[in-house]
Amino acid sequence: MKEKIPFYNEKEFHDMVKKTKKGTFSGWYIIDKDNKSVEFSGSFNRQFKLNKPVIPVNTEYVTRKEFNEYKVSNDQRLTKIETTLAAQGEQINKLTQTVEKQGEQINQLVQVVLLHGEQINKLTQTVEKQGEQIKELQVEQKAQGEQIKAQGKQIKAQGKTLKSILQALGGINKRLDKIDPPK
C-alpha cells in the first residue's frame, strides 16, 4: 500500500536532502511498502540520485494506469488535431488553387479590358476623324449653299431680264400686228 507523506517541516526536508546526497526538493513523496520504492512529486532544482532511478516531475503523483489513460487520451487528442490540421491543409490547398484560378481569370479579364480599351481608343479616333469630315462637309455645304443662293439670285435676275425681254417682244409683236395685219 502506498502512503503520501508531505514535508511538514524543514528537518524532514534536510533529512531527505542528506539521503539523496545532492539536490533540493520541495513537495511530497510516496513510499510503496510492497516493493520498497520511493516516488517523488514537487518542485526539483536538480535530479535526486537514489538507489532506484527517479524521474522528477513537477505535478502531483499519478498512478501508471492514470498516466496511461492520460497518454491514450492525449494521443487521441493529438490524432484529432493532426486530422483537423490535415483537413485544414487540404482546404488551404483547395483555396490556394481557387485563388490561383481566380488570379488567372482576373489576368484574362484584365487582358480583355485592355483589348476593349484599345478598341475604344480606335473607335474614338474614328469618331474624331468622322467629326472632322462632318465639319469639312458642313463647310462645303455652306459654301455650296452660298453658291446656290448666288446662282438663285442670278437666275432671278435672268428671270427678270427674260420677263422684261418678253414684255418688250410682246410690245414689238403688238406693234408689228398693227403695222402689218395678217392676211
Curated annotation (Swiss-Prot):
Query: InterPro entries, alphabetically?
Result: DUF16
Q: Name one Pfam family in it.
A: DUF16
The record's listing under SUPFAM superfamilies reads:
MPN010-like
The record's family statement is:
Belongs to the UPF0134 family.
Q: What's the name of the protein?
A: UPF0134 protein MPN_100
UniProt lineage = Bacteria, Bacillati, Mycoplasmatota, Mycoplasmoidales, Mycoplasmoidaceae
